[in-house]
């Protein structure tokens, strides 16, 4: 898989780390890392790391449909939890980006491009911050899918 080779080779320069889960090429575990410490999110991640004894990263799960790249992957935050309506993260942990919907998806998108764009969207919100009282409680997959479907309906995407 071409995307896997690219991720192994170049991802660290973009603050990304990702691998398939075991032998399953359809589910990837991703880490977004190296957020600037002078940003609200960077400070929150440092505090999260110290409080919960975890890496100061945003853990994502990326699930690929069998007809990828014709259909977009489903991407969700696993942990930490974000404050409501910050960082382009829905209340259920899905990513609020049209490019991850059928109407916004382009088959030429590759994994690295998707993740760089997600990271950029999160960082573009200067108010992106964690819910430090509940940050270590993971988002559930169904919770994320439900939030994603509500978002798609709200914005008229499909």
Would you name each region that the model predicts?
Residues 1-57, 66-158:
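UBC/E2-like fold recognition across ubiquitin and ubiquitin-like conjugation systems
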Residues 63:
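Conserved metal-binding segment of the jelly-roll/cupin
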